[in-house]
Amino acid sequence: MAIRVRIPTPLRKLTGDKGEIEAKGANISDLMENINKTYPGIKERIYDETGEIRRFINIYVNEEDIRFIDGNKTAVRDGDEVSIIPAI
């Protein structure tokens, strides 16, 4: 089993039009690194040049905003659902 990651419409061109993908990782940072290996270019759309999540991107683990947990160090495990949501 893996972690389900919901991809917003603006980033789907990088995932071959997939709205949901599966990936692995111990935390959000690991997860994003692994996603970027499979779908190059996605990380630079989510993170700024300092390595921080862009201000207009929100990431949720099981509907909990990672900004209020541990940010990039927020733990994830098999069966979790991660949503990447750009602010409107």
Please give the residue ranges for each predicted region.
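Ubiquitin-like/PB1-type beta-grasp interaction modules and other compact soluble beta-rich domains
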Residues: 1-88
